[in-house]
Amino acid sequence: MQRLILFFVLCIFLINPPIIFASNYSDGMNAMKNGNHEEAVKLFRVAAETGDARAQHCLGVMLNKGQGVKQNYEESFKWLNLAAKQGFSQAKLDLAILIYHKKGIPENYIDKFK
């Protein structure tokens, strides 16, 4: 019986891991609102790595601004691009701003559109 329960718990985890890690995004937002940017970055990174577009966007913005982490335009581009590819509209806007200012974009990125 215990093996059956363990099997079902494992199946639920494998089918939809973002549900389990959704609290990382919420906790990250709370940490950011309370001014604890370092903790927010850690929490957003965990959620972003599971594919949470909201967390990817927040992490990208924080990397862009250097909030709670050393400013890194290349990493910011990476996370904003991942969120934008999922259709997250604010990430698309922030990514466009990075591209316009040519910050953090790969050398051949703009050449693709010529």
Task: Go through each PLM region and give its residues.
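Bacterial N-terminal signal peptides
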Residues: 7-16
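Short helix-capping/linker turns of helical repeat alpha-solenoids
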Residues: 35-36, 49-52, 65-67, 72, ...
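Positively charged n-region of N-terminal signal peptides that target proteins for export
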Residues: 1-4
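Hydrophobic face of amphipathic alpha-helices that form TPR/SEL1-like repeat modules
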Residues: 24-31, 58-65, 94-101
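Helix-start (N-cap) detector for alpha-helical repeat units in TPR-like alpha-solenoids
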Residues: 21-24, 53-55, 89-91
